[in-house]
């Protein structure tokens, strides 16, 4: 099955590669020429605008980092909404429930179905094909793209058929991921400054009740190596935390712990960390603690 792919950056490019690996034809578009090149070398075709992509392809995937970017490619000049061939739009972005509902209504007026399909696992999971894929939308549309989106991960969870249901599911995941990273950063700096070997801490925590996505993946991969290259920038995580807090407020759910994690990352952002890797939050905790953990890997 041929498809279009808009946004082939840190997440979109490896996900597009998985579609090519499975024999699907792809037409791609990205404002970054260098991001498209590896896919073009594998015989993907180039679109010249979002509208051109939607003029050529019945199925279009979108992987973009921000709501503003998605809004522009959807509704801006030469946007997807102006295309004539697109019938199914698959949103893999974390953009929050209100925007998903907005784009679902706008596209429905044009005869286009929207499948909400946010993913979790970061660039490493996208490259390995081990993402957690969350999906919601019209059951027939979901089933049509299931063989394609299943290529990205080891699990596919259907959150329901309501617009935005998968966004809510993704935000629950991101709350836990962000809180775990902030808490793990503080815990490890405290322990190391108190004289503990970070590797000893890691082994004990991962064998006990404190293990989490930071201790099992982010710290071994990008913190204890001092590489801080997990592959996702801090401003993207902050955007997701903001969406989660807003969702909680809309539903009348107190988000005190999430708010505390937001303060940790907001403090780092005010120190210029917006474009740093999200694991670099450890360096900001270290700076405020007057202590730097040793490289152990």
Language-model regions, residue ranges each:
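Beta-strand segments within the central parallel beta-sheet cores of soluble alpha/beta enzyme folds
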Residues: 7, 199-207, 259-263
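Rossmann-fold dinucleotide-binding core
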Residues: 94-174, 178
């Amino acid at each position: 099955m041929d498809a279009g792919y808009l946004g082939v950056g840190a997440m979109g490019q490896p996900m597009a590669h998985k579609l090519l690996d499975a024999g699907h034809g792809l037409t791609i578009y990205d404002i970054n020429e260098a991001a498209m090149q590896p896919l073009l070398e594998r015989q993907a075709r180039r679109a010249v605008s979002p509208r051109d992509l939607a003029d050529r392809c019945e199925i279009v995937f979108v992987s973009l980092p921000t709501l503003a970017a998605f809004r522009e490619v959807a509704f801006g000049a030469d946007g997807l909404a102006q295309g004539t061939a697109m019938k199914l739009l698959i949103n893999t972005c974390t953009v929050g429930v209100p925007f998903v509902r907005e784009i679902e209504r706008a596209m429905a007026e044009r005869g286009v179905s929207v499948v909400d399909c946010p993913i979790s696992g970061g660039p490493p999971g996208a490259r390995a094909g081990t993402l957690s894929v969350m999906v919601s939308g019209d059951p027939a549309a979901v089933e049509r793209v299931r063989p394609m989106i299943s290529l990205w991960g080891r699990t596919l969870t259907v959150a329901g058929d309501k617009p935005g249901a998968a966004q809510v599911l993704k935000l629950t995941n991101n709350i836990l991921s962000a809180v775990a990273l902030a808490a793990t950063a503080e815990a490890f700096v405290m322990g190391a400054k108190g004289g503990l070997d970070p590797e000893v801490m890691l082994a004990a925590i991962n064998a006990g009740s404190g293990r989490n996505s930071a201790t099992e993946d982010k710290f071994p991969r990008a913190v204890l190596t001092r590489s801080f290259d997990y592959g996702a920038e801090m401003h993207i995580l902050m955007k997701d935390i903001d969406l989660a807090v807003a969702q909680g407020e809309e539903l009348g759910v107190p988000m005190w712990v999430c708010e505390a994690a937001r303060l940790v990352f907001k403090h780092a952002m005010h120190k210029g960390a917006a474009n740093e890797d999200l694991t670099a939050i450890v360096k900001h905790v270290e700076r405020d603690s007057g202590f730097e953990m040793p490289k152990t890997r």
